[in-house]
Amino acid sequence: MARNTPIERYRNIGICAHVDAGKTTTTERILFYTGLSHKIGEVHDGAATMDWMEQEQERGITITSAATTTFWRGMDAQFQDHRINIIDTPGHVDFTIEVERSLRVLDGAVVVFCGSSGVEPQSETVWRQADKYGVPRIVFVNKMDRAGADFLRVVDQIKNRLGATPVPIQLNIGAEEDFSGVVDLIKMKRINWNEADQGMTFTYEEIPADMQELAEEWRQNLVEAAAEASEELMDKYLEGEELSEAEIKEALRTRTLNNEIVLATCGSAFKNKGVQAVLDAVIEFLPAPVDVPAIKGVDENDNEVERHADDNEPFAALAFKIATDPFVGSLTFMRVYSGVVNTGDAVYNSVKQKRERFGRIVQLHANKREEVKEVRAGDIAAAIGLKDVTTGDTLCDQNAKVILERMEFPEPVIQIAVEPRTQADQEKMGIALGKLAAEDPSFRVETDEESGQTLISGMGELHLDIIVDRMKREFSVECNVGKPQVAYRETIRGTTEVEGKFVRQSGGRGQYGHVWLKIEPSEPDAGFVFVDEIVGGAVPREYISSVAKGIEEQMHNGVLAGYPVLDVKATLFDGSYLDVDSSEMAFKIAGSMAFKKGALEAQPVILEPMMKVEVTTPEDWMGDVVGDLNRRRGMIEGMDDGVAGLKIIRAQVPLSEMFGYATSLRSATQGRASYSMEFAEYGEVSKNIADRIIAERG
């Protein structure tokens, strides 16, 4: 079967933003203008098409990244059909994991900001994630009809707070209730969208006289940015020659793809103005799969290989999300990087080292699905019927095995105990938690060995609320929930050499395992690093992985208070064995014993999650807010001026001190202040707090 749309006309984009910037409404409008949804769904009516879980519609926030495929020919039907695969990403900070894994598989992004509140803490998080994956992006400043909306102020914040180089390609005409359209700075015309048909048609008109001067000034800025794309254009510009519209667009595209500039547009999705031009900008300025560097991976022999966006290369895809669908079971969302795969084909999961067969392949429009026979390089689709695939796994051709870069997922910071209400709920709860954990790598389930309780941990209170809510709705499991607990961790600060010897002699065959380990801190965030320095066969090859396994299992229970241990490097440098008595089990136990002994000698410490907190407050209450943060062991990192005389206080505060903060902030500031919080890093706790934690766990 031939390809319907050439890959050069594909755009895989994400729509990212912080909670209230109007991202879902923007996506809804995109679906409306591209002809996919005939009635515009409003978020505040709980009817948006992309938000397809019940909890999303109730809370008016997007939790899971729904993927959808649409086609666009341009506002003026000036292009051939382009296929746009859109991933709508959540804006709430507890779900940054969803954003992270979406950005991993996208080629470009549209970042939506609110015209009045501008760059908010969550926007910074999303921006940093997009920087990490080198995703080219354009900006849509939405809600220009809102009180306090100011396009150029937001552009300024993008420059100063995010360290980007924004280049406006539009200006707003009027703001707040007077917002009536935009000036296109490339064409130097006013765009007037027709309100009678919800903005489906438009006209170009002359720029209003009172805006002529401002438009000239920003047009100059835009041409200058374009000229910097090449020496040739710069010479032309400096000699006073006019750059043609095609030259300007080509130059802006080049610089956007190189992540040198970020083009800025504006509008109001709710008022049906501006989204149409954003779609044009996606086609003109964001990359096709062939415009981004080839994805790197490693083959079976650990050699680095690349996969190019080409149907003739071997098949390779990344599973970036697992979702449970009430009708078909498990859906595996994947981004195909190279090659072609048909329904019924056998493929290889190179991370799990297992074969899988594609039962059916569907392309989704929010939660409606359309079956397809095959998918090709550049496609985003979902496969039904894969047995054992986790987020981040690579699916590839059995004859050209490759592991694409793995995704990194954050450590959970908050933990609660859940217990089923009835015996019947007990079994169902196990199944439900297993499925939810497969969908979401930032959510973990474990059993407390001493109390036998089931503990679930995640990225924040809202994250766990939604998990409990989904157990009830999707799996009919009723459960009682304990008080949230902080997910402490342990690590070591010193270095030591230790011996672990396990000997058991009880008639017949005994057990014998003997190891010498050097235990030391690994690089921050490196996790567990195991180094094998055995020479001369002091420990036989076949037992070495057992030693590592023994250490790793022991790391689940730290020596101080039984919390998991982070960032340790263990070097196995000596040991001994007996031909008859040695076994994998004996060496596993020896490794575990040595680690336990070594961790006690290597200055063990307890770590606690430190949160990045931003409080926005009227100036009158600033002293109270700062005083309260200091009392909560917070470190004030800086203060900024917000909009409308508000102050923004940035601090790092231990999570353990932040429970109930929302209520206390409300009462301290008569409900005028708001805050946002996200995980920053693990920090060492002081001795007296460590003693208290150890005593509580006693």
Curated annotation (Swiss-Prot):
SUPFAM superfamilies assigned to the protein according to its UniProt record, in alphabetical order: EF-G C-terminal domain-like, P-loop containing nucleoside triphosphate hydrolases, Ribosomal protein S5 domain 2-like, Translation proteins
Top-level taxon of the source organism: Bacteria
Signal peptide boundaries: none
Alphabetized InterPro entries for the sequence: EFG_II, EFG_III, EFG_III/V, EFG_IV, EFG_V, EFG_V-like, EFTu-like_2, G_TR_CS
Keyword Glycoprotein: no
Keyword hit for Nucleotide-binding: yes
Keyword tags: Cytoplasm, Elongation factor, GTP-binding, Nucleotide-binding, Protein biosynthesis
Any one of the GO BP annotations: ribosome disassembly
Purpose of the protein: Catalyzes the GTP-dependent ribosomal translocation step during translation elongation. During this step, the ribosome changes from the pre-translocational (PRE) to the post-translocational (POST) state as the newly formed A-site-bound peptidyl-tRNA and P-site-bound deacylated tRNA move to the P and E sites, respectively. Catalyzes the coordinated movement of the two tRNA molecules, the mRNA and conformational changes in the ribosome.
UniProt protein name: Elongation factor G 1
Organism per entry: Aliivibrio fischeri (strain ATCC 700601 / ES114)
